[in-house]
Structure formats: C-alpha cells, structure tokens
C-alpha cells in the first residue's frame, strides 16, 4: 500500500506555525549575539524531517547571528516539540535571508541608471 502523503496545505500550515513559534521562542534566548531577528520564512521537507529557516537581522553581524542560532537550534527544537502537535519536529537549519539586501541593491542600481539616463537627455 502506498504511503499517504500529507497535503501541501498542511505543510504550509505547519511551516507557518513553526515560524510563529520560533519568533516567540527567540525572544527568550539570552545569547547576546542574537539581536533583533525576524524569521522571514520556513520551508519544510515533505516528511517534516528538516526545516530551512530564513531570517534577517536588524542589529549585529549576520554571520554571528547565524552561529548563535545554529548553537541554539537544539534548544529551539526541544521547545518546538513541546508546542507542536506533530509526530516529527524538524531539524532546524538556519539561513540568512539576503532578499532585502538584494532589493536595496537593485533599487540603487535602477536609481543610478535613471540618473544616468536623465543626464544624457
């Protein structure tokens, strides 16, 4: 008999719940390397074994924040286990989300191109 797959909506719901719970849990982490962190998104594997957690930070060095989050991953996993009502709580893999930085750079390049075009006209 084929294994029953969970629906894509359930995957999204669980990812959203993990995002909300991690945001709450990060407020309780006392590591000074973790400044103001925003969890941008969570992507789950279909079997819920792994979660890619994308974050941004307003303060501090993103690399130091990544190291601190990776160090705290075990604790965060245990706390998620207490909050989530699913059989498997995923292993957390943190990734710095560069989307905002890329958007700012693209905006700067567009502004620069428009300024150059205005000078030529």
Curated annotation (Swiss-Prot):
Location in the cell: Cytoplasm
Record's subunit section: Monomer. Binds 30S ribosomal subunits, but not 50S ribosomal subunits or 70S ribosomes.
SUPFAM superfamilies in the record: Ribosome-binding factor A, RbfA
Sequence similarity: Belongs to the RbfA family.
Top-level taxon: Bacteria
InterPro entries in UniProt: KH_dom-like_a/b (IPR015946), RbfA (IPR000238), RbfA_dom_sf (IPR023799)
Function field: One of several proteins that assist in the late maturation steps of the functional core of the 30S ribosomal subunit. Associates with free 30S ribosomal subunits (but not with 30S subunits that are part of 70S ribosomes or polysomes). Required for efficient processing of 16S rRNA. May interact with the 5'-terminal helix region of 16S rRNA.
Gene Ontology molecular functions: ribosomal small subunit binding
Cellular component terms (Gene Ontology): cytosol
Pfam family of the protein (one): RBFA
Any one GO biological process: maturation of SSU-rRNA
Protein name according to UniProt: Ribosome-binding factor A
Keyword terms: Cytoplasm, Ribosome biogenesis
Main location: cytoplasm
């Amino acid at each position: 008999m084929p294994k029953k797959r969970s629906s894509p909506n359930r995957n999204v719901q669980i990812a959203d719940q993990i995002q909300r719970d991690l945001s709450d849990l990060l407020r309780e982490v006392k590591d000074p390397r973790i400044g103001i962190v925003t969890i941008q998104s969570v992507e789950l594997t279909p079997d819920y074994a792994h979660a890619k957690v994308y974050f941004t930070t307003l303060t501090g060095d993103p690399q130091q924040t990544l190291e601190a989050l990776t160090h705290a991953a075990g604790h965060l996993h245990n706390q998620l286990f207490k909050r989530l009502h699913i059989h498997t709580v995923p292993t957390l893999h943190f990734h710095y989300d560069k989307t905002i930085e890329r958007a700012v750079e693209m905006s700067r390049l567009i502004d620069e191109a428009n300024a150059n075009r205005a000078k030529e006209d």
